[in-house]
A protein has these predicted regions:
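N-terminal presequence-like segments and the immediate start of the first folded domain
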Residues: 1-72, 78-132
Length: 132
């Protein structure tokens, strides 16, 4: 996998513009993961919900024999721009703890709500594991 970063472009913070995947391997597509825990309970804090969603993503990737380094795309659905911005430090810490220094192409969308009204974030993932 090769990250696309034209030399004349400024490097984005927290994501990459794109990746190229070349060769055989395994694609993994995860349904959107929200910030609800295994019991379906939600914390009210945006950073805590993002942390839970990211942990769920890492767990599912592990089930597929993959890790954060295999993520090639994230799509975030957020219910509040102000809460997201206020939770920046906590979200950054959660990212570092779960995804490390992996910054795949990402899209963030602000929406009016999610199916479960308690959810503040939902994250979809596409990953690719090269053949060995």
């Amino acid at each position: 996998m090769h990250v696309l970063q034209p030399a004349e472009w400024s490097k984005p913070r927290g994501f990459s513009h794109g990746v190229v995947v070349d060769g055989p391997g395994k694609w993994i597509v995860l349904a959107g993961q929200t910030g609800g825990n295994e019991a379906g309970e939600y914390q009210t804090d945006m950073a805590a919900q993002v942390a839970t969603a990211l942990k769920r993503i890492v767990k599912l990737l592990g089930e597929a024999g993959a890790g954060p380094e295999h993520i090639v795309r994230l799509t975030w659905y957020l219910t509040s721009k102000s809460e997201y911005e206020a939770a920046g430090a906590g979200i950054g810490a959660a990212w570092k703890e779960t995804l490390g220094r992996n910054f795949p192409p990402s899209t963030l969308l602000y929406i009016s709500g999610l199916v479960d009204a308690r959810a503040k974030v939902e994250i979809e993932v596409t990953a690719f594991v090269p053949a060995k």
